Amino acid sequence: MKNLLKKSLLGLAFLSLNGFAFADAQAVAELQQRLDKAMQYSADFEQTVRSSKGKEIQKGQGKFQVKRPNLFRMDTQSPQENLIVSDGKTLWFYDPFVSQVTANWVKDAVSNTPFVLLTSNDKSHWDQYDVTQNVDNFVLKPKSKKSAIKQFDIRIDATGLVKGFSTIERDGQSNLYVLRNISTAHLSESLFSFSVPKGAELDDQRGKK
């Protein structure tokens, strides 16, 4: 009797685990399907940064541009200018205030820069996250405990319109991005190329992996 009960419990546990895995795979497929509906778009964004206690620390704004597959550009204009560009292979971060550029391979930056997933269907990228869905809200959590990001949320409707996204860092600080003035007009691929500005210092992490 005890053995039968044990087997039943193990069976239920196995079914439960499979159910969760299926739900996760289903959420990934649904999110990828929605993202595929908008192959390119640009939008203005409003950013709100909050502390782990929910206190507003900073507000900012800028422009976000995506061209699938694998290209995106996030140009923060205030309160301090900076630029993030993915050219498909390298993720560039430029801080003009200190005149420094950091370069990482996209494949090595996914767990800390989940924005990459908005442009990618690469299985190796998506395998780094657990994904759950609640209607138009998708929650992505990195599997790596070394990731600086605790959670990445995407709000996207069934037509493929991304309305916003947010990150929660390990220390509890959150960044909310709300997209406005969304346009699906053609974007030149030249927007997603990057050259190190003259006089800027390059911190090239690509050769350190």
Swiss-Prot record:
Q: Where in the cell is it found?
A: Periplasm
Record carries keyword Signal: yes
**Where this protein primarily resides, as one coarse class?**
periplasm
Instruction: Name the domain of life.
Output: Bacteria
Q: Name one GO cellular component term.
A: outer membrane-bounded periplasmic space
* BP term (GO), one: lipoprotein localization to outer membrane
Keywords (alphabetical) are:
Chaperone, Periplasm, Protein transport, Signal, Transport
Q: Where are the transmembrane segments?
A: none
SUPFAM superfamilies per the UniProt record, alphabetical:
Prokaryotic lipoproteins and lipoprotein localization factors (SSF89392)
Signal peptide residue numbers: 1-23
- Alphabetized Pfam families for the sequence: LolA
Query: What does the subunit comment say?
Result: Monomer.
Please give the function described in this protein's UniProt entry. Answer: Participates in the translocation of lipoproteins from the inner membrane to the outer membrane. Only forms a complex with a lipoprotein if the residue after the N-terminal Cys is not an aspartate (The Asp acts as a targeting signal to indicate that the lipoprotein should stay in the inner membrane).
Which HAMAP family does this chain map to?
Answer: LolA
NCBIfam families annotated for this entry? lolA
Which family does the similarity line name? Answer: Belongs to the LolA family.
Q: What is this protein called?
A: Outer-membrane lipoprotein carrier protein
From what organism does this protein derive?
Glaesserella parasuis serovar 5 (strain SH0165)
